[in-house]
């Protein structure tokens, strides 16, 4: 590789003993690439390491982990107000890696690492909920959220993204729809929602394409609602009739307001947020991310 400015890798602590990653970093260092590595231990570490990255003058901060790690690092980057923030690099090491997968990030660690360091930095959108909590990939509510948050860690570690589906099938008889009202630009719907997906990215829950037309640089959020009063019949219909399915409601808007008569929970890139009122808005061009030239999430 040619000479590139230094990067700082923020590595999820669960991947600290990843031997192939150590070898990939060593090879790049042998080529003269400067890579600082910091390992997270607790919440807030990503913010501290992003602050350190600025002091070191690196041009790229690489998020090494799953969607939650990418969320923490990207949120810390968009909070930078003075000067130019480092670009975000993606190194998928989590259970599902939904955002990185849909963005076309290579699965091979060495290729992903090279892209994170040397890829073109593109401006992409993020989203913010209730003027506070951000997500880069997707906010999911209803059946999918409860499954994602309740799936045991050991099952996720053993089976990866498939674990969400297995745990969901085990819990189907106890899950009911969420009644809510959703408004957006030229959009209004109310009823019983089995699953709600509001996507900057396209997939969640270990590869489920909830918002298949979403783009990360169009200034819009994509909405998909899976409706129905009875879970099993509605889910069967959704899986077998994807075109013109009455159980699927789609929308697109720069913002969505959600009201529920009871508390519901949204999963924001793995981080649960509960309440009855949600204002979700897009943040156009919020950060720069190093992506492949043929990234399917770019218009």
Swiss-Prot record:
A GO MF label: magnesium ion binding
Entries under Pfam families matching the protein: DAGK_cat (PF00781), YegS_C (PF19279)
Originating species: Salmonella newport (strain SL254)
Residues binding Mg(2+), per UniProt: 215, 218, 220
Entry's family note: Belongs to the diacylglycerol/lipid kinase family. YegS lipid kinase subfamily.
Segments forming domain DAGKc: 2-133
Designated name of the protein: Probable lipid kinase YegS
UniProt keyword terms in alphabetical order: ATP-binding, Cytoplasm, Kinase, Lipid biosynthesis, Lipid metabolism, Magnesium, Metal-binding, Nucleotide-binding, Phospholipid biosynthesis, Phospholipid metabolism, Transferase
Taxonomic path: Bacteria, Pseudomonadati, Pseudomonadota, Gammaproteobacteria, Enterobacterales
Superkingdom classification of source: Bacteria
């Amino acid at each position: 590789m040619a000479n590139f400015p230094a990067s700082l890798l923020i590595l999820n602590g669960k991947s600290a003993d990843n031997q192939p990653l150590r070898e990939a970093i060593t090879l790049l260092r042998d080529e003269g690439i400067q890579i600082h590595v910091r390992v997270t231990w607790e919440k807030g570490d990503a913010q501290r390491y992003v602050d350190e990255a600025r002091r070191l003058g690196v041009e790229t901060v690489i998020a090494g982990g799953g969607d939650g790690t990418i969320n923490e690092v990207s949120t810390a980057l968009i909070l930078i107000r003075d000067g130019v923030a480092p670009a975000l690099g993606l190194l998928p090491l989590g259970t599902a890696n939904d955002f990185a997968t849909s963005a076309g990030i290579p699965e091979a660690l060495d290729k992903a690492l090279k892209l994170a360091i040397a890829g073109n930095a593109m401006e992409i959108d993020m989203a913010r909920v209730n003027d506070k909590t951000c997500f880069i990939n997707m906010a999911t509510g209803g059946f999918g959220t409860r499954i994602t948050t309740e799936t045991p860690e050991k099952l996720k570690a053993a089976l990866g993204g498939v674990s969400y589906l297995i745990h969901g099938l085990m819990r189907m008889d106890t899950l009911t729809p969420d009644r809510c009202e959703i408004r957006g630009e030229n959009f209004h719907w109310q009823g019983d929602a089995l699953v709600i997906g509001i996507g900057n990215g396209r997939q969640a829950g270990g590869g489920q394409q909830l918002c298949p037309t979403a783009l990360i640089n169009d200034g819009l959020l994509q909405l998909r609602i899976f409706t129905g009063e009875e879970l099993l019949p509605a889910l069967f219909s959704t899986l077998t009739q994807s075109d013109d399915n009455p159980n699927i409601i789609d929308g697109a808007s720069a913002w969505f307001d959600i009201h529920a008569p009871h508390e519901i929970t949204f999963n924001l890139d793995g981080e649960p947020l509960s309440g009855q009122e949600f204002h979700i808005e897009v943040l156009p061009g919020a950060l720069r991310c190093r992506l492949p030239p043929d990234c399917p999430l770019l218009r």
